[in-house]
From Swiss-Prot:
Keyword Transcription regulation listed: yes
One example of a Gene Ontology biological process annotation: positive regulation of carbohydrate metabolic process
Subunit structure of this chain's protein: Monomer in solution. Oligomerizes to an active state in the presence of the positive effectors ATP and maltotriose.
UniProt GO molecular function: ATP binding; DNA binding; DNA-binding transcription factor activity
Family annotation (HAMAP family): HTH_type_MalT
Name of the protein in its database record: HTH-type transcriptional regulator MalT
InterPro entries noted in UniProt: P-loop_NTPase (IPR027417), Sig_transdc_resp-reg_C-effctor (IPR016032), TPR-like_helical_dom_sf (IPR011990), TPR_MalT (IPR041617), Tscrpt_reg_HTH_MalT (IPR023768), Tscrpt_reg_LuxR_C (IPR000792), WH-like_DNA-bd_sf (IPR036388)
Family statement: Belongs to the MalT family.
Domain of life: Bacteria
Gene name per UniProt: malT
Lineage, uppermost ranks: Bacteria, Pseudomonadati, Pseudomonadota, Gammaproteobacteria, Vibrionales
Organism: Vibrio vulnificus (strain CMCP6)
Coiled-coil regions listed in the entry: none
Amino acid sequence: MWIPSKLTRPGRLHNAIVRPRVLELLQQAPYYKLVLFRSPAGYGKTTMAAQWLADKTNVGWYSIDDSDNDGFRFINYLLQALNKATNGNCNNAQKLAEKRQFSSLRSLFSDVFAEMVDFHQECYVVLDDYHVINNEEVHEAMRFFLKHMPDNLTLVVTSRANPPLGTANLRVRDLMIEIGNEMLAFDTEETTRFFNQRVADGIDEDTANNLRNYVEGWPSALQLIALQAQHQKRTLAQSAESVSQFNHAHLWDYLVEEVFDLLDADTRKFLMQVSVLDHFNDELVYALTQREDALGMIESLNRYGLFIYPLEGEQNWFRFHNLFGEFLSHERQARIPQQEQELNRNAAIAWLKQKSPHQAIRHAQKAYDGELVAEILNEFGWKMFNQGELSTLESAINLLEKDLLFSNPKLTMLRAWLAQSQHRYNQVGTLLAEAENEHKKRNIDLDIQYQGQANALLAQVAINSNDPEKALELAELALSQLDSTVYRSRIVATSVVGEVNHVIGRLDRALPMMQQTEKLARQYQVYHQALWAILQQSEILIAQGYVQAAFELQDSAFRLIEEQQLQHVPLHEFLLRVRAQVLWCWNRLDEAEECAYKGLQILENHAPSKHLHSYSMLARIAIGRGELDRAGKFIEHIQHLMKQSTYHVDWTANASLSLILYWQAKGKLNAIQEWLDTAVRPENACNHFCQLQWRNIARAHINLGQYDQARQALNFLQSEAEKANLVTDRNRNLIIEAIFAVHQKDENQAKVLLKEALQLTNQTGMVGNFLIDGATIGTLLEKLTNRHELGDLERHRALQLMKDISSNQRSRSVHFDEEFVEKLVTHPNVPELVRTSPLTQREWQVLGLIYSGFSNEQIAQELDVAGTTIKTHIRNLYQKLNIANRKEAVTTAENLLQLMGY
């Protein structure tokens, strides 16, 4: 799929004159981020860059054309060039790019820089003809690339226009060398050497100066003048006279009169035919022109100096100088317009022989040959789909006439899959219905395999739209229709059957279906679907109470991601999300927090609405640590996102838990009541997310003292959990029931419920749900352990919980939130120094973190401020409290906590 000539730098530079004044300026290039060659066409930007880098070993060259505005193609070529420059140090990132397994160009570049950390040699990457890029996503990514790339790498850009790469900032910071047309234009000395090298009679200084002034040092025009002198046997003085009125607007006329008309008709025809190709080798040219002497013609033209650049490599790839290529295109369309379609059609066929359907489609479209486009899509469409050429495919399909599109069921199915793969689920049904109707009009019978593929696709759409009954019906119908050879659709249908059974609480049926999905997906190397199946299995095992088994299964998902370079796909965030939820329930908050932040990084280039789960987890972690100020910031994010978007109950239930826990900790009963007034009440609770939503409702009623409604919700929860054998949810529900019993002043019942919950926790390991209500159940746990009412395992678990609850309460106190500080400064026994020299809220926070053992750097990270700011806060609080050092600060904090009864 990739064109070798785009990654090879121009060769055969022996005819180019050495330009010491430019090379001298470039000696300092390793100390700069960017070297920019910027000038109009024909000033020798590419030649100068190639000459300068000719003796450099670590160079990657990328020749850009307009097809590279596709971000996927651009990043692939760029990484191949970078890999060449770094001796293969970016292989993993290149594989990610080739498989389109990255969430954003920024995240992919982060991986690139991580891979380059051990490569310390001076290296260069050239982006030749960057001016053709008009894709803002590419520009933004390259600005990020420039900002963060390692110091041993220098980016070299040739462009006709000023590229939007933050060059003004680089210029001000002296991080860029700019070679403009003033520098690239020949001076008189260079003009003299240039002509002396090409013209037998040489040139005098006055004539050189006159010629140089006529064309303002424009190298391409000087080259044309030299050609004119050689072929018309004129002196350079005579040539100077003929170009005295030369300007850019007259370039075509000048080239016709002084170069093109001097060629024989056969050569002119050959050049015009070949100019339909942006890049070419002898095989392409032979397929296009049917000339067996294609390579000989190319080489003779190169020797003739007709702006054909030989490129490095064994494939004998060439390209025209951009200016000359544009000129030839102009002549071709003016002189042989009747051949334009045939030439482009032949070019398309030639590119197909090179196994490059992307280029073939482009030429077939230029030939206005819809039938050929359809043939290419029929033959290569699914291959291109699997390789991530989605935008090219969709553009090609959309440009097909209706008769061509709807005469090919394979293409209409591909069109629907393109919509589904780009998350436009609401369009899939419409597209398939339109296709079926149009096929009927044309008397095209859709075989049962087509119907099976359509039903599998519609089943996926139905489950995405929260319609499990319809999804199950369609998926089972699809499986009855599809042959085993139609593996993609069978995998999707099998997955949907498993997911539906998961949603409706038939876990014993859901698990084997997801295991079968994983097996099929691995067998046919559909790794995204394999990862999805593993994640579904993990959630099912968690619901069944086999949390450790789920955790180990997640490890296999991480291995699959590593093996298949899936680090940047959204499903990676799903895995991190489920892992974070397990870690939170096991009270491994630091690891859960790390997973949440990694998830945000993966989704950085996706809509903010996708960040809800991560913020929900971060808020819950902060609440668990007693960091209510920090939790408040996450809560604001959550509330904003929930107002802006519509979410599945799985998402809203998780977010609502964090909201209610925060309001519970802050005593905001009005907020809880407002939430309860509008809360979704699912008809059943046969899966983990509906269970969570009903627990949220029960918790809200308990906080508000609405005990009858709380009792009803709890009875419904346990009934549904037992019917679906949701062991882990039964575990969580028992804890909520115990809290309800405490509020009802029924201590004996609360202890019975806690004892049962502890027994289930031996299987699930769920301790986080105890800890969030530690203040309520801590005393009961102590009584259970003191009276020897528990078995050995349960007693050990209860003792550990009591220790964690005590630690959490201490953690809350040492963070010195506003409520704690207000009570402290109004305490009758508080030292006078504290009362008369009040600390700011931030200084109290710093004191608490010092007491917790945080270093200055850790405090800065915790509060998200600069280290110098923390030093200022510490200096201020030391002065106000008459403290000499950190040890005294810890003692002071300890005394204040003891004063408050901690």
